[in-house]
Amino acid sequence: MTAKPHLPVVPIEDVPASLPTNTSKKHRPIVLVVDDESAIADTLAEILTLSGYAAMPAYDGEEALETALLMPPELLITDVMLPGMSGIELAISIRRIFPDCKVLLFSGQAATSDLLASAKRAGHQFTLLTKPVYPTDLLKRVSESLEVSQPAHRS
């Protein structure tokens, strides 16, 4: 008998029929989604892709950096707790290379607040989503993050 892992992603039947989408017909913002649980990274990337974003999953910090160098992201969405390089370390590294990249962190871990406080003391401010990540919350935060960074795309 094998145990099924519990993934902190909302069941598809709980996803509203109408989700916020990227309304720009010309511009598909590149979003890099990172989680060591491939089902979560893949699901979030798929939600974003279906909503009009060019989303790519990665499963650890090193892979995310390699992917970012090939396709510079406008937004990084990463789990805080990754093996090896933490999501916060990844976010700082990505911003060193791509200073205009926006960052959304997500976590279901209580220890995250200590890591965020440490990053803030070092001058890094990040937005945090908590697991489970609901599609409507994800898309709202993505839209808000990209609106701030791209005022020229507003109608």
Where are the regions a protein language model picked out?
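Acidic catalytic/metal-coordinating carboxylates
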Residues: 60-63, 86-89, 107
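Charged docking surfaces used in two-component/phosphorelay signaling
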Residues: 42-50
